[in-house]
């Protein structure tokens, strides 16, 4: 199993980044809930835009993550879950640092035991469809931030910060 690219002790604190960058900080306004076993994580961004369909999420987390963070814009829908224990486990096995879901997750009790950062709006036990609709590696926007593939994302208990590095 690949080693994660970062651990909680090596992640730069989002508050420290905010102090360093100042008023121009790209800080996500959306108040996400932490579901993963890793509260602090960082990595290069990969994105998916989908709506109640998680096939692209499943496929992407099945690829080598190399310490990246998958940002999923699910249109803020909590009608179906886009990530559950099996898909998140694929992310752990493939070296992903974290997943941000602008939508819902499920299997939350198990997600808390996995060594991966997972933040989402909430939970829903209903699974999503898997038709493959959506887009990958395109800029997505929510919470006042545009998440651009290849940029750096930092996440901890205080929030989510994005910066070009």
Curated annotation (Swiss-Prot):
Q: Does the keyword Iron-sulfur apply?
A: no
Question: Species lineage, top-down?
Answer: Bacteria, Bacillati, Actinomycetota, Actinomycetes, Mycobacteriales
The UniProt record gives the binding positions of substrate as 84-87, 106
Name any cofactors this protein relies on: a divalent metal cation
Is Glycoprotein included in the keywords of this UniProt record? Answer: no
Q: What is this protein called?
A: Putative 4-hydroxy-4-methyl-2-oxoglutarate aldolase
List the InterPro entries.
RraA (IPR010203), RraA/RraA-like (IPR005493), RraA/RraA-like_sf (IPR036704)
Q: Which reaction does it catalyse?
A: 4-hydroxy-4-methyl-2-oxoglutarate = 2 pyruvate; oxaloacetate + H(+) = pyruvate + CO2
Q: Which organism is it from?
A: Nocardia farcinica (strain IFM 10152)
Q: What does this protein do?
A: Catalyzes the aldol cleavage of 4-hydroxy-4-methyl-2-oxoglutarate (HMG) into 2 molecules of pyruvate. Also contains a secondary oxaloacetate (OAA) decarboxylase activity due to the common pyruvate enolate transition state formed following C-C bond cleavage in the retro-aldol and decarboxylation reactions.
């Amino acid at each position: 199993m690949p080693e994660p690219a970062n651990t909680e002790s090596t992640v730069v604190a989002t508050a420290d980044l905010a102090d360093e960058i100042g008023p121009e900080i790209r800080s996500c306004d959306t108040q996400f809930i932490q579901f993963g076993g890793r509260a602090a994580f960082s990595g290069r961004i990969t994105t998916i835009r989908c709506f109640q369909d998680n096939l692209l999420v499943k496929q992407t987390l099945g690829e080598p993550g190399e310490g990246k963070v998958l940002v999923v814009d699910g249109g803020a829908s909590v009608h179906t879950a886009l990530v559950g224990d099996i898909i998140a486990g694929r992310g752990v096995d493939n070296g992903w640092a974290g997943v941000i879901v602008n939508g819902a997750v499920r299997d939350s009790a198990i997600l808390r035991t996995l060594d991966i950062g997972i933040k989402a709006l909430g939970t829903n036990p209903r699974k999503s469809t898997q038709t493959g609709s959506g887009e990958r590696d395109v800029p997505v926007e929510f919470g006042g931030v545009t998440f651009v593939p290849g940029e750096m994302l930092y996440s901890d208990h205080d929030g989510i910060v994005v910066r070009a590095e």
